[in-house]
């Protein structure tokens, strides 16, 4: 049964299968039909790093599939405070559950967990590295709003150095051949040259631009991230860049009529709240999609579909 640790663990066919399954789940919910795909299964949720939306949506997803859930939140709530290693924690959870969902502040922690565990591991965010289920949610919403994922123009805006959501989103896009992807970030938040080269080597038509204003008339999708304050090694560096960009309603009005704006949330001050009431806002669609997409991912990883 497959892990979902890196978005590149999934090929295009896998992603489309998850999207189609999520659509079926939404249809079932609309018609009050229950799907107990994980009945008599146990899903362990190890959330060492703080989380609200991701943890709650995984809990709800597992419960809607009729699974039992075991939730460990924060280092203080686990045996880590007693000195237990991540290795031992994963070993224990692997013996009493069928799937492990892990969120951790260390890059590569989910990959490590998958090497320790015999059962499937799903990465709910590991440091600044990746957040694969969020990228599935993001692409699911784009697909739903745009009727497909191919041949679109994207702008990815904000913290492109530390935001794992942006990193996973860009890697996921490599599967769908967008027409172009514009990266817009303050100098200190630009992606590394190594990551840019990786994206280009996978065929992504990616361009760094200084101003969103210069490309917004041609863009179909804008993906915005907050500045990841908690990931800065030096707090004074965060102070220099906080508030350095904002997507305003006036700026959005300069784009296409069917332009959509995504944001993985939470937001701080980088996204104008006036956009919320316009057809451009797709970020609350992302919240709504989080449960069906994560239900589909859990079922796929468990091998029941």
UniProtKB/Swiss-Prot annotation:
Keyword Protein biosynthesis: no
Catalytic activity: carbamoyl phosphate + L-aspartate = N-carbamoyl-L-aspartate + phosphate + H(+)
InterPro entries to which the protein is assigned, alphabetical: Asp/Orn_carbamoyltranf_P-bd, Asp/Orn_carbamoylTrfase, Asp/Orn_carbamoylTrfase_sf, Asp_carbamoyltransf, Asp_carbamoyltransf_Asp/Orn-bd
Residues given in the record as carbamoyl phosphate binding sites: 53-54, 103, 131, 134, 265-266
Molecular function terms, GO-annotated: amino acid binding; aspartate carbamoyltransferase activity
EC number(s) recorded for this UniProt protein: 2.1.3.2
Record Pfam families: OTCace, OTCace_N
Pathway, per record: Pyrimidine metabolism; UMP biosynthesis via de novo pathway; (S)-dihydroorotate from bicarbonate: step 2/3
Keyword Transferase: yes
Coiled-coil intervals, chain numbering: none
NCBIfam families noted in UniProt: asp_carb_tr, PRK00856.1
Subunit structure comment from the entry: Heterooligomer of catalytic and regulatory chains.
PANTHER family per record: ASPARTATE CARBAMOYLTRANSFERASE, ORNITHINE CARBAMOYLTRANSFERASE, MITOCHONDRIAL
Protein name according to UniProt: Aspartate carbamoyltransferase catalytic subunit
Organism expressing this protein natively: Ignicoccus hospitalis (strain KIN4/I / DSM 18386 / JCM 14125)
The gene coding this protein: pyrB
